[in-house]
Amino acid sequence: MREHYGVVTPMHNSRPRRVAVLSVHTSPLAQPGTGDAGGMNVYVLQSAIQMARRGVEVEIFTRATSSADAPVQEAAPGVLVRNVVAGPFEGLDKQDLPTQLCAFVAGVLREEARHEPGYYNLVHSHYWLSGQVGWLARDRWGVPLVHTAHTLAAVKNLSLADGDTPEPAARQIGEQQVVAESDRLVANTTEESDQLVRHYGADPNRIDVVAPGADLTRYRPGDRAAARAKLGLDPRETVVTFVGRIQPLKAPDVLLRAAAELIARDPESTLRVLVVGGPSGSGLARPDALIELASSLGIAARVTFLPPQAPDRLVDVYRASDLVAVPSYSESFGLVAIEAQACGTPVIAANVGGLGVAVRNGETGLLVDGHRTEDWATALQSLVSEPGRLAALAAEAPRHAENFSWEHTADGLLESYRMATVNYNYGHGPSEFAPRRAGGLWKLRRAGGVRA
């Protein structure tokens, strides 16, 4: 069918040569586990690296957050990170970022204007803020837009933690626009695909389900005793670990309350809770607040706090743990669960969102319905009190994790890009470019015009 799409040029090949990836609110180079950096950062960087290894150049646009940020950084061969100055470097809350989207758009368009038309063959936006930018870039450049939401306001607002702040209506409106304008939508799971259809009216024929992954060359089973020695953990204790941003959505307090209940039931328990992460979001977001909670629950001596860890150190955290807990109220997938299982560590997780895919219930971990302290304590106790069961889960966990790699993710994304490009070219035909304007900028003329 490709012959029906007109003259084939690099811009109109089904496989892109160069992709503009948009990650407005957080840099792929930021340390996951603090601020707004989390699984999305890992996703953007690792998928870009894998696509570059397949011959697709990737340029990631993100908002500069420090005057020390170089305008361009090479993240890996074939992967550039462009730090766009849009608003103050520090002190700009995530909720205020929409006020700087015009400045960010200008930075992205100016970079493209330095090149010949067709320099970028496709735009892939991550999160709704980036989707707003991608929508305009798509229309200006005459290339397809692929969008990954990562989280959805409508879904988050249905399962808020106590003390958490609802997502504003403006975000849901913005998401609705991006869903309508994207040429392809990438969902982490079939459940997320269903949510896009149910809450945003997305066309299911434009959704591609592509699971995230883990770096399976890094995250793999290792010596638990050696890992505990590196972290200063007692080899005789049973370690249950939380890894992630300290915010109501991630629910580290659920783990602490469950641990306190378990210890109250069994004072001889050797349970140790390890919390690895930094503050983010609203409500119960300060590490100090968790420290105070542990103290009020009478388990302060049983809880160890560590700051966010770099990947080579995070491997030791997973290996040192008997169990990793993911008690989130909402989770589109849950990379921590896959990374932990890849290291041979079972996972106990809330039965929400993509965690039902990331964890194989009863085989590589345990899924808990709801967030009641009693239920979580009982689930924890059922695992830590039965070493044989825990060992069986640990043995199966890496085999399950092998199904999730960034190589598989990149292959899925490239297929989505192919579909987006073929469909876009079929619907729009080749774009026309007017001569350069003064100052070296290109002006795009499209058959259907450019929406205001």
Swiss-Prot record:
Q: Which domain of life is it from?
A: Bacteria
**What protein name is recorded for this chain?**
D-inositol 3-phosphate glycosyltransferase
| Positions contributing to Mg(2+) binding | Y318, R319, S321, T345
Q: Which family does it belong to?
A: Belongs to the glycosyltransferase group 1 family. MshA subfamily.
Q: Which UniProt keywords apply?
A: Glycosyltransferase, Magnesium, Metal-binding, Transferase
- Do you know which Pfam families this protein is assigned to? Glyco_trans_4_4, Glycos_transf_1
Q: How does it assemble?
A: Homodimer.
- Binding positions (1D-myo-inositol 3-phosphate): H25, D36, A37, G38, G39, M40, N41, K94, Y127, T151, R171
